């Protein structure tokens, strides 16, 4: 159990740092599009989780430490629903209702599509 906790923790740090780097870069280069980093990491994270899930289904021998580390730790640290919610609220409060609705729709449906695509890639 301690090995699983360590794997999740270490991979979570990596995912979180990658999300932080994406947010920092977007804020520095495109401050008007602050939400783009959250959108990107959530869509990419959905693709990654789909691929990992498909791989782990076909390879049950992969140790639980690796599975949990990558899915719960890395992807969990990389993606974030709370930031998505805050970004959407900020857009709504600033009167950018169409953009907020588009962002929310793309995030949800894009995430579902990316997860499906990732899983499908493992079935080729």
Swiss-Prot record:
Binding annotation for Na(+): 76, 79
Cellular compartment(s): Cell inner membrane
Record's keyword annotation contains DNA-binding: no
Catalytic activity: fluoride(in) = fluoride(out)
One GO CC term on file: plasma membrane
Keyword field: Cell inner membrane, Cell membrane, Ion channel, Ion transport, Membrane, Metal-binding, Sodium, Transmembrane, Transmembrane helix, Transport
Residue spans crossing the bilayer: 5-25, 37-57, 69-89, 99-119
Endoplasmic reticulum in keyword set: no
One biological process term in Gene Ontology: cellular detoxification of fluoride
GO MF entry, a single one: fluoride channel activity
Membrane topology value: Multi-pass membrane protein
Activity regulation text: Na(+) is not transported, but it plays an essential structural role and its presence is essential for fluoride channel function.
Family: Belongs to the fluoride channel Fluc/FEX (TC 1.A.43) family.
NCBIfam families, sorted: PRK14234.1
Main function: Fluoride-specific ion channel. Important for reducing fluoride concentration in the cell, thus reducing its toxicity.
Name of the featured protein: Fluoride-specific ion channel FluC
Organism per entry: Pseudomonas syringae pv. tomato (strain ATCC BAA-871 / DC3000)
